[in-house]
Amino acid sequence: MNLSKIHHIAIIVSDYEAAKDFYVNKLGFSVIRENYRPERKDWKLDLRVNEYTELEIFAEENPPKRVNRPEACGLRHLAFCVESVEQTVNELAEVGIECEPIRVDDYTGKKMTFFHDSDGLPLELHE
């Protein structure tokens, strides 16, 4: 078996326009496809993260609230690899996104921090 790359990660959001603004206009992901699915009454937005990975965003009417405890079963957070955590934190601040204080990962020895998307999903920056 050769599972070489992650093709996509799918998330459900509560506010389609807020999520689209966050991931496209603030994080800079490009739109691949955007579709309203009337039979499901939801939006599906496919975004290019890099040459290998896509982020699928689903926005449906009245989704259940996200469990507020990150240790609940399921997706805990998304982590993005960056060359410089400091530079990326500064770039995020320029578009109004606050990050936690930068710290060193106890296991990798690399700099890291967290911020949150428009629904409170934790997003990590990791060198």
Please annotate each region the language model reported.
Residues I12-E54, E94:
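Core segments of cupin and vicinal oxygen chelate
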Residues N2, N35, D46, V89-E127:
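Vicinal oxygen chelate
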Residues F22, E86-E91:
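Short amphipathic alpha-helices within nucleic acid-binding modules
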Residues K41, G74, G109:
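Exposed loop/turn and edge beta-strand positions of beta-sandwich/beta-sheet ligand-binding modules
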Residues E71-E86:
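Mid-chain, well-packed structural core segment of small domains
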Residues M1-A18, L75-L78:
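N-terminal beta-strand motif that seeds the catalytic metal site of vicinal oxygen chelate
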Residues N50-E54, N62-P63, V85:
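Short, charged/polar surface micro-motifs in flexible loops or helix N-caps
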Residues I32-E34, K41-W43, N62-N68, P101:
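A short, acidic/glycine-rich surface segment
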